[in-house]
Amino acid sequence: TRERLRQTGFAAAERLVQQLIHDRQYESAIPVCQAILAHDRAWEPAYRQLMQIYSAVGNRPQVVNSYNRCVAALREELDVEPSEETEALLNRLTS
């Protein structure tokens, strides 16, 4: 189905971002995350990846900004709060 293909594409993009993060190619990883979010504002894993990227380059304000954008998107699109995984990542990256 179309939804399954979309999710498969997002999963492939997430794997690409993880590889780029592993290779410390942070500037290349950011647009991939942004492309995912352009198609689905509430795709929480992309926000977590952005948080990891911004933390890796020492940009703590963007870590928090990415989290806040995630919270807003999840509330507006799905009426839910971020997952425990996202909350734990924020705490780990900002403590």
Task: State where each predicted segment sits.
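Intrinsically disordered, charged and Pro/Gly-enriched terminal/linker segments
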Residues: T1-S95
